[in-house]
From Swiss-Prot:
Subcellular location: Mitochondrion membrane; Peroxisome membrane
Protein name: Transmembrane protein 135
UniProt keyword Cytoplasm, yes or no: no
Bilayer topology term: Multi-pass membrane protein
Pfam family, one: TMEM135_C_rich
Chain's role: Involved in mitochondrial metabolism by regulating the balance between mitochondrial fusion and fission. May act as a regulator of mitochondrial fission that promotes DNM1L-dependent fission through activation of DNM1L. May be involved in peroxisome organization.
Biological source species: Bos taurus (Bovine)
UniProt lineage: Eukaryota, Metazoa, Chordata, Craniata, Vertebrata
TM ranges: 68-88, 96-116, 149-169, 298-318, 331-351, 380-400
MF-aspect GO terms: lipid transporter activity
């Protein structure tokens, strides 16, 4: 607490906009760079989203450009206003405190910026930043020795999150919208208790398929014979009466689930690597082949495939053991399926899903009347979360997620890295740890402290 009251007498030029003594010109530099990068980010993003959603011509003519400009304005405002409040706070306080160059400047900037963005996007942005802020606070705690890291902690968190998600998925009206659709795509509609696919309908379809096969000429090719053999093996085998996978036995049901989601995971990772591979198509053609046999492709495939197969296998096993189908099975099956993250460890995925789970449970509590509703909660949470991340970006970059730090550098055209962090080292956060050899060249006419003098608290 004592560190919060300590201060240094340097001005905003000496600490923040070291490339330009003028606060106004520095603000314009940040604004121009942020606007340029924001348009580069949101223009293709909204265009691709519109194509995938099969928007009509009216959307492209009247709504696409305003939405791009609104989101770009939000991101630009977040970066530019941080620079503005950075200078304003220094002029008001007359000094820099531990909290003022990061948290203090980012809090009002983020609050004003999020009000510019469309309401439909605020919730998603809040979840992302809350997740990032939580991860940053955790790393700060670890760096200070307050928190002890848990081996495979991200896997354990994912197991707990998966258990709760799958339980809500199995419950009637437990999940809605995109989350429900995504889980139905991953684990299949057979695991939904309200699944309306009756055994009679299933067997009727099987008979129809058989009749169609019989109508075909006898000269069947090898592929058709193999397919017929596989179908025969899948249909004849152990399947509990409570299992709703009517066209498969329990074993083939799990195997098919693994193969399907392994393929999906493999293809997703391949697609993510396509842009970087094509950039080196002419200079390093061999890198194009690595697109298909990269280790991460198989890791993501193994993660998704094993998650589905473990979940389905455990669910079938519990139905056999207990001789009934129960929503509580999903808790055990989901927890065990979460172990699959050992193939593809990701703190980002675990934290994001956990944040979404908290949001889901919060809104369920509101619907049940057990939790109070807080107006503008998303705006406040976003502002505080972003301020925490900016505090880390200024005072202790080593605790910030590397991908977000790269994003901040891109948004500010690299100017976030030219802050005079050696001066900030006196606060004891290791501000210059990642910048040991950088010292800005300052014009002595605009400085308040001679750079050669030792820095002391005032």
């Amino acid at each position: 607490m004592a560190a919060l009251s300590k201060s240094i007498p340097h001005n905003c030029y000496e600490i923040g906009h070291t490339w330009q003594p003028s606060c106004w010109l520095s603000f314009l530099h940040i604004t121009r760079g942020a606007l340029e990068e924001s348009l580069k980010i949101y223009a293709p993003l909204y265009l691709i989203a519109a194509i995938l959603r099969k928007r009509k011509l009216d959307y492209y003519l009247h709504k696409l450009l305003p939405e791009i400009l609104q989101s770009a304005s939000f991101l630009t405002a977040n970066g530019a206003l941080f620079m503005a409040f950075f200078c304003i706070l220094r002029k008001i306080l007359g000094k820099f405190y531990l909290w003022s160059p990061g948290f203090g400047a980012a809090l009002p900037a983020s609050y004003v910026a999020i009000l510019v963005e469309r309401k439909s996007r605020r919730g998603l942005l809040t979840i992302y930043m809350a997740n990032l802020a939580t991860e940053t606070l955790f790393r700060m705690g670890v760096a200070r020795g307050v928190i002890t890291t848990l081996r495979n902690g991200e896997v354990l968190l994912f197991c707990i999150t998966a258990a709760m998600y799958m339980f809500f998925f199995r419950c009637k009206d437990g999940l809605k919208g995109f989350t429900f659709s995504a889980l139905r795509f991953i684990v299949g509609k057979e695991e939904i208790p309200t699944h309306s696919y009756s055994p009679e309908a299933a067997y009727a379809k099987v008979e129809q398929k058989t009749e169609k096969h019989e109508e075909k000429p006898r000269g069947m090719n090898i592929i058709a014979l193999v397919r017929k053999l596989v179908d025969s093996v899948c249909k004849h085998g152990p399947r509990h009466r409570c299992c709703k996978h009517y066209e498969d036995n329990c074993i083939s049901y799990c195997i098919k689930g693994f193969i399907r989601m392994f393929s999906v995971g493999y293809l997703i990772q391949c697609c993510l690597r396509i842009p970087s591979a094509f950039r080196h198509l002419f200079t390093q053609p061999s890198r194009l082949l690595s697109l298909f046999y990269n280790k991460e492709n198989f890791q993501l495939g193994a993660f998704l495939g094993s998650f589905v197969s473990i979940y389905k296998g455990t669910s079938c096993f519990l139905r056999w053991v207990r001789n009934l189908d129960d929503e509580l099975h999903a808790i055990i099956a989901g927890f065990l399926a979460g172990v699959s993250m050992m193939f593809y460890k990701s703190t980002t995925i675990s934290m994001y899903l956990a944040s979404k789970l908290v949001e889901t449970m919060y809104f369920k509590g509101i619907e049940a009347g057990k939790v109070p509703y807080f107006p503008h909660a998303d705006t406040i949470i976003y502002s505080i979360s972003t301020a925490i991340c900016f505090q880390a970006a200024v005072m202790e970059v080593q605790t910030l997620r590397p991908s977000y730090w790269k994003f901040l550098l891109r948004l500010t055209k690299g100017r976030f890295a030219v802050m005079n962090r050696k001066v900030l080292d006196v606060f004891g956060t290791g501000a210059s740890k990642n910048f040991p050899d950088f010292t800005p060249r300052l014009d002595p006419r605009y400085t308040t402290v001679t750079p050669e003098l030792p820095i002391e608290f005032s």
